[in-house]
Every structure is written in C-alpha cells, then in structure tokens.
C-alpha cells in the first residue's frame, strides 16, 4: 500500500499516440512479458467500462445546428452577387473561383465551430459528441458532415465543382448532391473507379520490390551518411526524435574540441536530448541509402529493431517488414477518406474592423491601388500604415501591417465593426500551393474584340496565343456565322446586306444603290449619290491608298477582248478638303500602250491646245508633280523620237568624245555603259553635264545647198506599189531628220527612228460607274478627255529604270447650269473605306450642295411634303453588287436579315461569313423624361418603339449609311421658340441663329464611323467621337457622354430614366436623341499573366477556349489524398505542376553561379547527387501524406523502398559500349564497380523507376515471372541465357528451397563460415611453411 501511495495519479485523457509511448517505455523498463500482462488488464478495464456505460447511437442523436438555415441563405446571396459581377465583367473566372471557395469554406467552418458549443449546451452527454472526441472512431470533421454541411467538392481531376453540397447526412442528400459527394467520399459504385483494393495490391508490390533485402553483415564499412540539423526550426522536436532514434552515427560528434559521441554508436533518447540541449552541428547518420550493397543491408546501416529496441539481428527480413509497414496503414488511409475526401478547403483571411463610426483617414502616398484576389478594388500598403478614424469626440488609431489590403477609400465614412483591411496570410502556406491552369470557354458565338492593352502580335510564330500585359476586357460581339461552301465567293460580296424574302432563289439580281421606279430621291436643292468605284462586272476590289489617292486594279473582260487580263490602275483622286469644282478631274487612267521606257522628244501637230491655266472651259488638274504643265490635246496621233540621256556631274570622267559615234555597251563613265549605239552629244548646263546618244543613220550630203533649210523635219513613209499588183506597201517608217553642225564647221544629217502613237478611243471610264447615278441628276455629266503630259518638242527624260507615261485618260465631272442648279458651284466628295481582315474596299460619295437644309420626298410625288416614314414599300434595294442566292443560303438566312461580313482564313480565303442581324442588337430608350432648359424637342420622324432595332433602318449597304429614305430622320431640332414649319426660303444665317442641329453618328460592324454631315464626309476616329444626349447649351445638368464604339457593361446607368440602368452589355453602334443602339456582346475580364487564344476579329463558336489563367491554389483534400497519393509517389507519377518559368530560372542561376565558381553549375550536379536529392524528396513526400492522416512510420522503412526504386541507371550511348548495350538498365553500384575495373569514365543517366517496373527489373527472373508477364519474362530470360542465383526469398520459395532468412540464414551462414575457416587454415599453413 505504501508503494501504491507514492505513485502519481494522472487524471487526463489518453489518446492513441500517448498509449504508444507508454507501451514503448513499459518495454524499456519491464520487458515484453510484463508489458503484455499490463496491456491485458487495460483491455479488460476498457471493455468493462464500455459495457457499464451502454452508449447507443440513434438518428435522433444527430442534432442539426439551428443557425445553419440563415448561414446557407447568406452564402447563396453572396454567390448570386458574385455571379452577377462575373457576368458584368467586373471579376474574372479565377477571382470568382477563389471567392466562391472562401464563401462556402467560411460557412462550413463557422458551422463546425458552432457544432461543439451547440452539443455542450443542448446535450453534453450526446453519444455523437462523446464519440467524436474520444479518438476511437471518427473525429470532429466527420461529425460536422453528419450534422453540418460538406460545402464545395472536387471532381476526379481535382477541379472544383461549382454546386456546393448544402445538405448534411442527417437531412438527406439530393440526387445531385449524392453523385457529387461520391467523387470524394468513395461511396457505392463510384468507389470502383478509385479501386478500394489498392491497399492490398500496394502491399504486394512493395514486398515484391524489397523481398530479397536481408541483414547479412554487421558493418559494410561505409563512411557516408545523411545529415540531420538539430537547429532546423522547420522540423518539430517530435519529428526530429522520430528521425534520430534507433539510428547509428556515421561520424564522430564534437562540441568544440571534445568528442562526445563516437562513430557507429546507436542513438537513444538520452543522446537525442543531449544533441538538442547542446545545439550541436549537423549530425551524420547511417541510412539504407548509403549501404554499400543493394542486394542486402548491414546491421549498422539499418539501426535498431523497432521490436526489441536493440540492433537488428543477422538474417532478419527487413525488406518484407518495410513493405508491410508501409502497406498496412493503407487500409486506415482508405477508411479515413470515407467522409472527408474531396472536400474543397481554403483559408479564411484575417480582417481588421473599424472600432467605431467615423471618417477614415490615411496617407495615400503609402498605399497603392490594386485588385484583391477576389477582384475588389483595394489599396496595398508595403509598410506599416497608420489609419485614423475620427468620430464625434474620439479619435481611434489602427495600425495596418505591411502587405495588407486596405478595403476603404480615404475620407470615407465607415461604420462600427465594418471591415476596413484584410491581412494577407503568411508565407508558410506557399508549400501547400500548386500552380494550375484554368481554361475559360466562350459562352456564345461571335467575333472576338480586345483593346490595345493586349499584344496583337502572337507570342510565337504560327501561333494564336497572345500575352496580356495589363488588365483588360475581352468582348465577344454577337453575330451568326455561316459556312459559304455552297455559294460561289465571286457572287457573294463582302458587306452585302441581304433580305432573302425579297430575292428569288438562284436568280441573278444586279442592283446598285439607287434602282427601280419607286425610289426615294432628294429635293432639287440637294443631290446625294453613293456608288462603288468599280462596276458590278468587275472582280472584288483590292485598293491601295497613297496619300489622298486610291489606286484600284481591275480586270478587263470585254473592253479589249482580253479575258481576265490584269490591267493597270485606275486612280480616283479626291482633294484634301473634299471640294470638287466644275470641270474637275475625278479619275484618271494610265494606258500602258502609251508608256515607254526610254527618254525622247514628243512631236505633234497642235490642232488645238488648251492650257490648264486658261480661264475659259477650265479643266482643273491635280496630278503628280513631275508633269508640268499639262495640256489637253485634240489630236489623233503624235510622234515620239527616242534618245538616251545621261545626267553627269562635272567631276565625272567621260570616256567618250562629243560628236563621236559609239556602239552598244560602250563605257561612258567608269560605272555606266550605253544601252544603244549612235551619235554622242555632250552639253554642259550649269553644274551638270548632259550626255545624249542619238540612234540612227548618218549621211554626209554632197551638196549642202540642195538640203532643206529646216533644222529638223519629219518625213512620212514612202508608198511603193508592187509589180503586177494594185496594192501598195510601205517602204520605210516615219523618219526624223536632224541637221548636225560640228565645231569644225562640218555638216552632216542624222536620220533618227520615230515611233508613231495613234490616240484612239481609250477606255470609257463612264462605264465603270452605275448609270443610275446620272438618272438621279439629269444635268450631271462625266466626259472623257485625253491629256498629253509633255509639250511639243519638249525633252522627256526618265529617271533610272522607271517608265514614262505619255498620255493620260481623265474623267471630268461637270454639271449643266439650269434653274434647278444655278447656285450649285461645288460638290463634296469623300471616300468611304471598309476594311475586313486585310480586305479593303473603298466607296465614293458625292454631294452636290446648294444649301444646308434639305428635304426628302418621293420622286414624282409632289403631294408628299416633309419627311416620309419608313415602310416596306418605300425601301430601296441597297445591295451594291449582284449576288446569287441558292436555296440553302436562303433557308439559313430566312430569319436573319442583316449585313454580311466576310471572314478570312489563314490563307486569305473566304470560307465563312458573319451576319449582324436584328437579334444581335438591343435598343435602349426612349429617353422621354430628359429635361430641357427653355427648349422644345421636335421629333421629325416617329419610330416604332421596340427593343430590337430593325437592322435595315440602322445599317446601309456597307453598314456605314442608312437608306436614303431615312437619312435625315435621325436629326432633331432644338430651338428657343417653337416653330410650326420650316420655310424653303430660309436663309443660312437665320438657320444658324435659330436651330441647333444634334449630329447623329453610326458605326458598322467593322468599327468604321459614318457621320451624315453635309459639310465633311470623312471617316472619324471612334475613340474621339463623343456625343451628348442634348446639346450642352441646353442641358440643365450634365449627362454621361457616350462614345460611338464604346463598350458598355450590363447594369451600367447611362442616363437617369424610368427604365433604370442598361439591361444589356455590348458596343454602341447607333446613337440617336431618343435611343442608343447596342450590338450585344459578352465581356470577359482578363488579368496580366493570362494567355488569349485566337486572333483579333476572329470568329469564335460556343465552347471554344477563350482565355487560359495560371494561378496558385491550395492543395485540397481531394480524391487523391491518402493511399492513392502514396501510390502516385511510389510509382513515380508526376503529381506536382512544373513551373513554366523553370528554364528561365535555371539560366539565371547558371549565370550567377558561373561568376562565383568560374564553371557552369550543371557540371557540379552528377548522377550521384541527383539520386541523393531525389531519395530525400521522395521520403519527405510519403511521410507528409502519412503524417497528415495521423499515421507514424519510421523513415528507415520508406528508405529501403525508395533505395530500390532509385538504384537503377540507364547506360548512355557513348559509355561502356564494350560491356553493356546502350539503353540497358543496370544497378548504380554495379556501374561504379565496372568503371573502376575498366579504369575509364562512366557515362550513365539517372532514372526513377516505379515499384512495378522495379519488380520487373531485378536479378532474379523467377521473381519477375511470378509477379507479372510470366510468359514474356521467361522467354526473354531463356533467350538471354540468364542465371538466377536464388538470393531472394521468393525464388527459393517457388523452388522449394531454404529461405535465406532467420534459421535458414544461419545454415547458409554456417556453410559460408566453414568454407572461410578452411581457406584461412590453408593460408595459415602456407604462411608457416614459408617461414620454415
């Protein structure tokens, strides 16, 4: 009794780990027999108490937390708001994912924290509450899912499933929640997909790898080991003790100069405490990694046996023990994943809350604006930020730590307990994160658009990946795409606007901008027409823009009877100010038949020459600078006398003399040769020398007086009649005779060849323009005139190898003066440019302007006054080209009346087109409650209020102009005083004083802006065009400004109306006083680091990959936790994502280490160092998985397994070819020994083999054949002549021999020792005899 009274009584709960420690200490003190007796008494006591208590578990014991209902409702509300922000384009997919995880994780964690107080208050002796904290079966997390909620789950790939499980097992799961739960919870049939039998199969594979590892020697003699640092703060004391206890030291340990522990001494708990207290240097311990043989292991490298606490005995099968030690807890890992597997976890951040109500103030210079990981605007502070909250009488100071987010603005009023800052989590969580990719898919079909914040050039050649340097929006503009395989692309033109119900099937329909009888025309005071610059009979237009001139190549088909021959360019020229006067040249054409490559002189008979400077019948010519002056010639032919001209500097060395005769390719200077032969004439002009070469024949006349006194004459060809024929034939061509006088007063005649040009009727340029253009304006004239660009007798000199144009055909615009157009003195012309993926088309628009107000009425309908309303019968045909519509296209477009836009593929071929129809647009308005200051709004034309804009009203033939009928229906007049009518004789100055015209702009699908202004018809920059709802002079208050082409997100309030904010997101394409037309679009937010797939303007379909985000996420307790993750590591499957910048990091590290060591660092990393680091990394990964599940395994068991899967190397092609074949797998120690024996360098590569491959690459083919692929293994072994030395357990077991472990090892050991004794005896006798 006295001894029992001295014992200490511990009144505390003992868990499973504490019981293990007690049993270990009992074995040390009392031995195995007495310890087993004590444990029997503990078992009896436990069963007796459990029987007495008689706790039962029923479904009524599962008590649901009362606050769960409103917590889940609040989480759903936050998720709904988050979904709206994502739809509006405020947050991207990754930010939505992160915030969704945190919302549901915080809700689930709050329910788990509320679970214990709820049980304690309502039912402290609840069986569920007692069992969950006893440690016998279950834990708080499992009970939490019984009475709380699971939250978000993961799919088999580890990706989050958006639908959270809100129900618990007490309430019952829905069918969807049950299926989602099955992925991680391993229930039912779903469990077969993840193989519950992995635990047993893993044990078998582990034993196969290490079954031959037996302790065969006491010491292998190695001097190597691994180091363990006792000062490592990242390693807890418990893990340090588990790592060191039972090991053997590989080196002596010193404290100063004193040796406290010698080598080859095993480490007990006493030595470990001394190491921790003295903080010694790193300790080198022996390990199975450093043992000198792979087929067995020594006692000192293994250490103490965990059974009895002493060094392991010889003959012990430590390999099988290691395999079972790792495989057996796999059943526990599988069971532990039953409830908690697959639950997506996250970390809740720490928040700083306001202590009271007041206004917050801080130093803005110490904080920088940024985005939080949830996409919210915030300020990031890099240093301690002092925040002051001023209330009525009290000032509160709050210190925000560095790298935290401030969630409020300066001078903002905050309420008490409001979150003002978020403290970023520590860096210790970085080890638990991994980089993953998330693909964002397009939700709709349409056209991709992005801003200048995105690199338009692909990152790599022949790639469609673009890098995002700044945060930007991607927009998918709505539109319907159709393949055009069945339609001839030469018939279907880009930017055609089709209305299929008005076009017959498979019928050719040739239509221009203004056709048919029931047209809409302008009043006589204003003429407007617009037409293509080429005829419908020509092919598609590709134009080049040079300054203010457009060069348009086209194909001749019938004009010169040349089939599809590419002819030179027609240039349509518009002045910079856009003003064209009468008799102005509108277009010109350079005929190639009047083009020459050589210099010369033009000669012609001047029947009528009109200079462009004449006042009467003025022909205004704006040509190229070289052609001055220009002449209009009324002749039918002219002559061209060729000659070669060279302009040389004074310093040039001329190698020919004046008046000399040279041949072809005669050197003129050091670097020039003549192209023709003839007479050389040298003339000095100012600082230049002009050298001419006249080709022809030279004649020396006998009598000078008989020669004509003309200095130069043209002689026509002689006509010679043939004998016995009435026909005559030209004997010679035209000749030019020139009188030459030399310096010595010698005379001779030079007869030069002449080229005759007949000016015939050239191309009728009028035919290239639609005839309806002239019908619309009766007195409009277009006439063709020929211009000779050089004067009579003027020298024509070419520049280098450029050709010289002699005649130019011009198209002159003119109109007759009559009563209707007496005051029209000028016309306004402009080009409309349409660019579609590199395909550029230009259209010409001309306005004959008299006054600045115009009215619209039907032709021949004087009863109609003012403006007409829109109806189907008044609609003109607006297709500027002919098209053939086949039946399938008509069916596909029967519900889609819209404008066509061609889409080009990579080969610049039209393969599909997109149609912008009414269903792709949204009308916002009307804005009827907008107030005016002393102003009255007049609607000139009433439109039917519909949320869908009729595309035929808003978009014209190119998408850049509405129909003529409704051209001015978009104008609204605001006046100081109400005016009942507008008189026709209203003068311009009065109009300016009376009216304020609100301009209307329109934009097509190609983002070109059209402004129907009578004065300036240029294409405007969409980013500089702003428009107000009302003229600023009449606004009572400021309204938001809308930019044409601007992208507007959904739920954005543009103007204060009864209709509320904008209901749709898209791009502004129509702006009117009463409404704004928006092309529907879906926004996608992308942040820096994301990659965009596709090109600008490319057509995307629903489901296509749009953006790829790369982000870090916490490793969740997904389906690969526990046993499957251990299997992944042991089979050497990749479970970590490799950093995409790994190569750049290695290059940077290589540069730095080269400067330090003088050699690249890669030469320092050999195969041996790589194997050592890989072994340590694999051991740590496996231990991390088991420790996370509460399972403790000694490192030596894992080291034996890892040692086997890392002991093979791959022979390189350039090494040991005389011993091993390239690509052969051999042991590492075997390769090293062979290299030492051959005395040559060893070339091999490290290799990590999984446990399955290692089992099939052993020294025993019997062991391999009994594991897998029996026939293949035996056949290869027979062909190779392999020998099995029967060193392992399995092969001896198969053949019925003695297993070389335990007593069997002793028998083998006795045989080998007897042989060794005999050998020693013989050697001893030999030595004794040698001494005699």
From Swiss-Prot:
Disulfide bond positions: none
Cofactor: Zn(2+)
Protein's name according to its UniProt entry: DNA-directed RNA polymerase subunit beta''
Binding of Zn(2+), residues: 220, 291, 298, 301
Biological classification of the source: Eukaryota, Viridiplantae, Streptophyta, Embryophyta, Tracheophyta
InterPro entries noted in UniProt: DNA-dir_RpoC2_beta_pp, RNA_pol_beta''_euk, RNA_pol_Rpb1_3_sf, RNA_pol_Rpb1_4, RNA_pol_Rpb1_5, Rpb1_funnel_sf
Any one of the GO CC terms: chloroplast
Superkingdom assignment: Eukaryota
UniProt keyword Disulfide bond, yes or no: no
Subunit structure, as described in the record: In plastids the minimal PEP RNA polymerase catalytic core is composed of four subunits: alpha, beta, beta', and beta''. When a (nuclear-encoded) sigma factor is associated with the core the holoenzyme is formed, which can initiate transcription.
Compartment list: Plastid, Chloroplast
Encoding gene (name): rpoC2
An individual GO BP term: DNA-templated transcription
NCBIfam families named in the record: rpoC2_cyan
Cofactor binding annotation: Binds 1 Zn(2+) ion per subunit.
Keyword field: Chloroplast, DNA-directed RNA polymerase, Metal-binding, Nucleotidyltransferase, Plastid, Transcription, Transferase, Zinc
Sequence similarity: Belongs to the RNA polymerase beta' chain family. RpoC2 subfamily.
Top enzyme class: transferase
Family annotation (PANTHER family): DNA-DIRECTED RNA POLYMERASE SUBUNIT BETA
Molecular-function GO terms, alphabetical: DNA binding; DNA-directed RNA polymerase activity; zinc ion binding
EC number: 2.7.7.6
The protein's role, per its UniProt record: DNA-dependent RNA polymerase catalyzes the transcription of DNA into RNA using the four ribonucleoside triphosphates as substrates.
Substrates-to-products reaction catalysed: RNA(n) + a ribonucleoside 5'-triphosphate = RNA(n+1) + diphosphate
């Amino acid at each position: 009794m006295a001894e029992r009274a001295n014992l200490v009584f511990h009144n505390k709960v003992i868990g499973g780990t504490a019981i293990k420690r007690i049993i270990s200490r009992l074995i040390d003190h009392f031995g195995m027999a007495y310890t087993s007796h004590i444990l029997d008494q503990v078992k009896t006591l436990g069963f007796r108490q459990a029987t007495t208590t008689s706790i039962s578990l029923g479904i009524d014991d599962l008590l649901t937390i009362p606050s769960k209902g409103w917590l889940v409702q609040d989480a759903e509300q936050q998720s709904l708001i988050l979904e709206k922000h994502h739809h509006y384009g405020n947050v991207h997919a990754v930010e939505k994912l992160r915030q969704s995880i945190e919302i549901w994780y915080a809700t689930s964690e709050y329910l788990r924290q509320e679970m214990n107080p709820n049980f304690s208050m309502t039912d402290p002796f609840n069986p569920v509450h007692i069992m969950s904290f006893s440690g016998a079966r279950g834990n708080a997390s499992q009970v939490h899912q019984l009475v709380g909620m699971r939250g978000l789950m993961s799919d088999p790939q580890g990706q989050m499933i958006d639908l959270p499980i809100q129900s618990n097992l007490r309430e019952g799961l829905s069918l969807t929640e049950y299926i989602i739960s099955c992925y991680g919870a391993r229930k039912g049939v779903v469990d077969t997909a993840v193989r519950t039998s992995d635990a047993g199969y893993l044990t078998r594979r582990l034993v196969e790898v290490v079954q031959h590892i037996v302790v065969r020697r006491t010491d292998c003699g190695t001097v190597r080991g691994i180091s363990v640092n006792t000062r490592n703060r990242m390693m807890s004391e418990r893990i340090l003790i588990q790592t060191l206890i039972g090991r053997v030291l590989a080196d002596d340990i010193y404290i100063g100069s004193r040796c406290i522990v010698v080598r080859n001494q095993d480490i007990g708990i006493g030595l470990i405490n001394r190491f921790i207290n003295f903080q010694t240097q790193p300790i080198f311990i022996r390990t199975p990694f450093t043992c000198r043989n792979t087929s067995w292991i020594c006692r000192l490298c293994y250490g103490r046996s965990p059974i009895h606490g002493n060094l392991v005995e010889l003959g012990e099968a430590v390999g099988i023990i290691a395999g079972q030690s790792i495989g057996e807890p796999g059943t526990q890992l599988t069971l532990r994943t039953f409830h908690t597997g697959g639950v997506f976890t996250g970390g809740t951040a720490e928040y700083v809350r306001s202590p009271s109500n007041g206004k917050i103030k801080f130093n803005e210079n110490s904080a920088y604006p940024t985005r939080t990981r949830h996409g919210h605007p915030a300020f990031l502070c890099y240093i301690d930020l002092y925040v002051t909250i001023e209330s009525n009488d009290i000032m509160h100071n709050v210190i925000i730590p560095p790298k935290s987010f401030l969630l409020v603005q300066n001078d903002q009023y905050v309420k008490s307990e409001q979150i003002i800052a978020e403290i970023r989590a520590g860096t210790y969580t970085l080890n638990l994160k991994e980089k993953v990719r998330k693909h964002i898919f397009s939700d709709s079909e349409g056209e991709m658009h992005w801003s200048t914040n995105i690199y338009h050039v692909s990152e790599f050649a022949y790639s469609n990946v673009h890098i995002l340097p700044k945060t930007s929006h991607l927009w998918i503009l709505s539109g319907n795409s159709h393949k055009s395989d069945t339609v001839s692309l030469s018939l279907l033109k880009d930017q055609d606007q089709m209305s299929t119900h008005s076009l017959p099937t498979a019928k050719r329909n040739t239509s221009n901008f203004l056709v048919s009888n029931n047209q809409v025309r302008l009043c006589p005071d204003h003429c407007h027409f617009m037409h293509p610059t080429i005829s419908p009979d020509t092919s598609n237009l590709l134009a080049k823009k040079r300054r203010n001139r457009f060069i348009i190549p086209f194909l001749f088909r019938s004009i010169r009877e040349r089939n599809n021959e590419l002819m030179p360019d027609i240039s349509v020229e518009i002045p910079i100010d856009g003003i064209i006067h009468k008799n102005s040249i509108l277009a010109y054409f350079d005929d190639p038949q009047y083009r020459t490559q050589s210099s010369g002189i033009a000669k012609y008979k001047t029947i009528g020459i009109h200079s462009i400077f004449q006042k009467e019948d003025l022909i205004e010519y704006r040509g190229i600078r070289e052609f001055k002056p220009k002449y209009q010639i009324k002749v039918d032919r002219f002559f061209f006398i060729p000659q070669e001209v060279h302009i040389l500097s004074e310093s040039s060395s001329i190698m020919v003399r004046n008046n000399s005769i040279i041949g072809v390719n005669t050197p003129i200077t050091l670097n020039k040769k003549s192209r023709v032969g003839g007479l050389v004439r040298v003339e000095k002009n100012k600082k230049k020398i002009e050298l001419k070469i006249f080709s022809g024949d030279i004649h020396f006349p006998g009598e000078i007086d008989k020669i004509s006194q003309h200095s130069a004459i043209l002689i026509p060809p002689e006509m010679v009649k043939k004998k016995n024929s009435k026909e005559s034939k030209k004997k010679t061509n035209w000749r030019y005779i020139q009188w030459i006088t030399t310096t010595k007063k010698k005379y001779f005649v030079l007869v030069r060849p002449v080229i005759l040009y007949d000016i015939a009727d050239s191309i009728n340029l009028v035919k290239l323009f639609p005839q309806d253009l002239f019908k619309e304006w009766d007195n409009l004239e277009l006439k063709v005139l020929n211009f000779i660009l050089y004067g009579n007798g003027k020298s024509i000199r070419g520049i280098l190898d450029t050709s010289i144009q002699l005649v130019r055909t011009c198209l002159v615009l003119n109109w007759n003066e009559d009563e209707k157009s007496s005051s029209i003195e000028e016309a306004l012309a402009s080009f409309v440019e349409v660019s579609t993926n590199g395909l550029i088309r230009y259209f010409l628009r001309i306005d004959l302007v008299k006054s600045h107000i115009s009215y619209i009425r039907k032709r021949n309908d004087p009863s109609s006054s003012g403006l007409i309303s829109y109806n189907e019968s008044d609609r003109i045909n607006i297709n500027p080209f002919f098209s053939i519509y086949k039946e399938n296209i008509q069916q596909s477009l029967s519900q889609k009346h819209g404008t066509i836009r061609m889409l080009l593929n990579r080969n610049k071929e039209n393969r599909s087109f997109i149609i912008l129809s009414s269903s792709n647009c949204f009308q916002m308005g009307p804005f009827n409650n907008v107030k005016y200051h002393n102003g009255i709004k007049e609607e000139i034309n009433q439109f039917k209020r519909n949320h869908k804009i009729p595309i035929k009203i808003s978009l014209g033939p190119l998408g850049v102009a509405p129909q003529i009928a409704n051209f001015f229906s978009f104008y609204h007049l605001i006046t100081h005083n109400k005016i009942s009518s507008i008189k026709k004789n209203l003068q311009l100055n009065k109009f300016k004083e009376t009216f304020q015209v609100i301009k209307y702009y329109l934009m097509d699908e190609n983002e070109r802006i059209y402004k129907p202004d009578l004065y300036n018809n240029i294409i405007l920059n969409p980013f500089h065009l702003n428009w107000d709802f009302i003229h600023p002079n009449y606004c009572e208050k400021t309204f938001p400004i809308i930019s044409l082409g601007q992208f507007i997100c959904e739920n954005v309030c543009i103007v204060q109306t009864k209709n509320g904010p904008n209901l749709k997101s898209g791009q502004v394409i129509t702006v009117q006083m009463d409404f704004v037309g928006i092309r529907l679009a879906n926004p996608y937010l992308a942040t820096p680091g994301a990659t965009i797939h596709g090109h600008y303007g490319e057509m995307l379909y629903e489901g296509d990959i749009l953006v790829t985000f790369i982000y870090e996420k916490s490793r969740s307790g997904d389906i690969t936790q526990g046993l499957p993750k251990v299997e992944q590591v042991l089979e050497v499957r990749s479970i970590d994502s490799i950093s995409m910048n790994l190569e750049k990091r290695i290059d940077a590290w290589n540069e730095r280490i080269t400067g330090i060591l003088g050699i690249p660092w890669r030469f320092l990393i050999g195969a041996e160092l790589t194997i050592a680091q890989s072994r340590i990394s694999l051991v740590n990964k496996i231990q991390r998985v088991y420790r996370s599940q509460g399972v403790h395994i000694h490192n030596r068991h894992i080291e034996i397994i890892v040692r086997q899967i890392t002991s093979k190397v791959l022979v390189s092609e350039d090494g040991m070819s005389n011993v091993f074949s390239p690509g052969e797998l051999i042991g590492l120690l075997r390769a090293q020994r062979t290299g030492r024996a051959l005395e040559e360098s060893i070339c091999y590569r490290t290799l990590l083999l999984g446990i399955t491959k290692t089992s099939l690459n052993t020294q025993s083919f019997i062991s391999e054949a009994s594991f897998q692929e029996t026939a293949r293994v035996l056949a290869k072994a027979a062909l190779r002549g392999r020998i099995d030395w029967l060193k392992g357990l399995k092969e001896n077991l198969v053949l019925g021999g003695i297993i070389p472990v335990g007593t069997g090892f002793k028998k083998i050991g006795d045989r080998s020792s007897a042989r060794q004794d005999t050998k020693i005896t013989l050697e001893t006798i030999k030595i004794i005899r040698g001494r005699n």
